[in-house]
Amino acid sequence: MHLGTRLLLSGVALVASTRTFAAVPPPAPYGPVPTARQLQWQEMEFIGFAHFTVDTFTGKEWGYGDESETVFNPTAFDAGQIARVARQAGMKELILTCKHHDGFCLWPSSFTDHSVKNSPWREGHGDVVKEISRACRKEGLKFGIYLSPWDRHSAVYGTPAYITYYRRQLTELLTGYGPISEVWFDGANGGDGFYGGARETRAIDNKTYYDWPNTIALVRRWQPMACIFSDAGPDIRWVGNERGVAGDPCWQTLNRRDFSPGNADSARLNRGDRPGTDWLPAECDVSIRPGWFYHPNEDGAVKTPAQLLDLYFQSVGRGATLLLNIPPDQRGQIHPPDAAALLEFARRREAIFSRDLARRARATASNVRGRARRYRAENVIDGRRDTYWATDDGVTNADLILKFPRPVTFNVARLREFPPLGQRVEGFVLQQWQDGQWKDFAGGASIGHCRLARGADVTTDKVRLRVTQAPVCPAISEIGLFYEKKD
């Protein structure tokens, strides 16, 4: 059973268990709460993007739509290598650009000739989507699809006929390639393009043209557990930039009614809304290279492992998910410097998070809900995500102390709330006991799914989490302490 499903069932069971444990009921959920598919998506934390199309061979970032199908001809395509590198990097999912703005399809679609079936690759019998999806399953990765709503090749783009065409292609992808875990709807749409030879500029009303409710219903029909990404969700929101950086705070909630795909208030998307009407966690997209597609002249500009680790702390560490683009090269493989950076990035994360120093401690709290074992302080260091420390209703400011039998040295901390009960904490500080007094190590407003903090080396035998602001009693699932060796 997926952790996300287990967390959701745990939350449901806790609420249902009030009949048996009437004296100590669980906290009531606060505000919007995640669905099972959102919980499964959030638990991945780090996923990959593979931008690959004719642009890989033309040097463009946005193809005009007039590119010949013969341009697409990877010399040594290896879906297994791509998926293997993604898995070795620690990614849990890989999203493929099945069709980018240029309109070229990486699968032999029945509804256009502008696809791999008219390319020289595999003598016109290839299917990139099939090979990547199968390689992902072999490597234990989930598979996601990107299908650009904007199509600069299609002669009917901007007319009602295009919506039928788009949904037919979407249905091909949703029904022909096994389980899909994420469907990615880009906000870029409308502008100049080839458009079947018209070579003109076309504008659409991006609030109404795509009829998103019916397209979303199509995804729900064929892939009910797939999370849908766009500026407005309904499951995942854009973080508001392509730098991979979430706001601080980055609330898990947003007033979704204020947004639609292609209509982005970047500042609000970056930070979320508090309070918010919808559970809509952020996804931080960024490329390992300056561009989204592979270009040989960028081989010397691949992000370093240190830069990738910084991005991890600025995305996952603020409650979002990191979506890192790893574009295949003109061979059809992850280029060597990219792969090397990814593997070293994975090694550094493992070196930090494989050893949780907090597990050595004894935990006590200023208040435990009903003095019940199921809400005890020790739950934050038990290594489980389906248990938590909670306080009595009305106790919204509380302390939890970790006491160590001997001093430990740490410089990284990780905090987690219990998402099935909503995002509850609005202010916290993490402190260490030094020189006879409590000193601040980290603090902020949001914790949510995950909060990471880095600081100077600290040696102490006591650490204290203070919840300083919350509208309801807190529910904290984890306090972790780690040590990062500096270069």
Q: Language-model segments: which ranges?
A:
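Noncatalytic modules at the cell exterior or secretory-pathway interfaces
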Residues: 456-468
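N-terminal signal peptide c-region/cleavage motif recognized by signal peptidases
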Residues: 17-20
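Mature catalytic domains of secreted/periplasmic carbohydrate-active enzymes
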Residues: 23-381, 387-396, 401-402, 409, ...
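Sec-dependent N-terminal signal peptides
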Residues: 10-13
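Inter-blade boundary loops/turns of WD-repeat beta-propellers
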Residues: 418, 433-435, 484
